[in-house]
């Protein structure tokens, strides 16, 4: 592909995001989405632009979302954090609204490399705090292992993938699994599982947030590629001499 072709793909991805943003029902989601900046990375990522929500002033704090989610996962804590920190919320590579033509494969190593490039582009080199939710918790530990001198605190929210070994899902099961996760009834069920009191807390706004990124071109293929890699597992071995706190819900059905 030529540079012009990648540029066109990037523009189409941004156009989809802008359309999705205007359809958001949750005012907190819209508030967060309005702070998205499109960060252009180097040729390693085909010079594409990636969505990163950035707001506030102070010491930097990066928030890492979970599997098959997006930056919108943090809409309910963004405004509060923004009062005291420079908040940075990227979509992980191959997830959310990130362009799916940045690479031919999606795996934990590529995600970490991408995050390091995001931080370098934003010139963040020290005093970085990390909040990682679900799979984002494992991502946080691996990131801190790669750049320990840049990190000073980590908060893990119901972290997933800390133990065990990666389980590669071969073709065509990875594609079948990704297609299954795209079914509306499956999305609704998973969304409800993420809340302790789904009957009271889950409505149209929450269900929309959980699925709005599925319209990104290449969503299924990037998800299948990540599944084929085995994903994050056994990341407790990456724990460094960095202050870490873990917070889990009493009735966390996903964990």
Predicted regions and their residues:
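Short beta-strand/loop motif that positions the catalytic acidic residue
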Residues: 240, 246-252
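Active-site loop/oxyanion-hole signature of alpha/beta-hydrolase fold enzymes
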Residues: 35-46, 50-53, 88-131
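Gly/Ala-rich beta-loop-alpha elbow adjacent to hydrolase catalytic centers
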Residues: 132, 136, 140
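Conserved HGGG/HGGXW glycine-rich cap/lid loop of the alpha/beta-hydrolase fold
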Residues: 48-97
